[in-house]
Amino acid sequence: MSTPRELLQQLLERRDLSPEQAQALLAQLTDPQTPPAMAGALLAALSTKGVVAPELLGLALAMRRLARPTGIPAGLRAIDIVGTGGDASGSFNISTGTALLTAACGVPVIKHGNRSVSSRCGSADMLEALGVAIPANAEAAAACLAATGFTFLYAPHYHPATAGVAPIRAVLGVRTVFNILGPLVNPAQPPLHLIGAFSLSVARLMADTLAGLPIERAFVVHGAEGWDEPTPIGPFTVFDVRPGRVDAGLRSPSDYGIKSCSAADLAGGDAQDNARALQAVLAGEDRGAHRDCLLLGAALALEIAGETRHPQEGVARASAAIDSGAARRLLEALRERPA
């Protein structure tokens, strides 16, 4: 196995690591015996060189192996819906809302997330503001999924090995590979994924990496005006991923029968502001751009799951989940569950 100095030298020479070397790199980064200065140098050198798909694949495989068990049955056909963040959009937590609406449509959702890192309000912050308790352990998370069709896996509970990296990332103060690893390392390893990426190049990188992971299907999306979500603002790129294969295409909100909106229409605030906005959509009270945005995301999730054959069919099904009260009832059921 390569030593930390050998890995650092290779990165400084701008030579890519093999997947096996990337796994060795993660082992060094998560080893408490690795000096913080060396861990910081390795992270900075990798970021400066630029991460490539074989490296990201090796890192993701290593992190998945280190993750704590979730207690969720293997092989469950569920989806994770997440954005990388980092797009500076200040939106109202689109991925969290999309995840709840998708679950209300009957597709099991295992959302993996954290507190705010690159936005004013992360997915854990958002759920708590909605009155939803974060499952305290794997047993509670699995029980929540079985009872409601939705659960949240709080990343620090399942990836303790990376705890020592957090202060190093904070000191560096720049984007590192961990900003894009999170969406790839859901500890339950659901076979379906809807991932938003903050740049087109990162979307392609994540798609190429997912093609080497044990998945069934995933969409990696980069939105109009640099958003890390599909939105009604404008056309968005979709990388359609299956094992060993990536197909790219451009889609428009009009394909889904959704009218365009401005970025200002999707503006968010703090956790309480965002919770009020999302609750209004799920209760059927807001029929504007916020609703359209969640309908669009849910339609994509339903397509990934093979539940629909036409874009507008997905929108109709998501609309019905709101108008029938199913989305509101899901939120109420989640609020009633203990941590």
Question: What is the role of each PLM region?
Answer:
Residues 50-113:
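Active-site cofactor/substrate anionic-group-binding motifs, chiefly glycine-
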Residues 43, 92-148:
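A glycine-rich phosphate/pyrophosphate-binding beta-strand-loop-alpha-helix module
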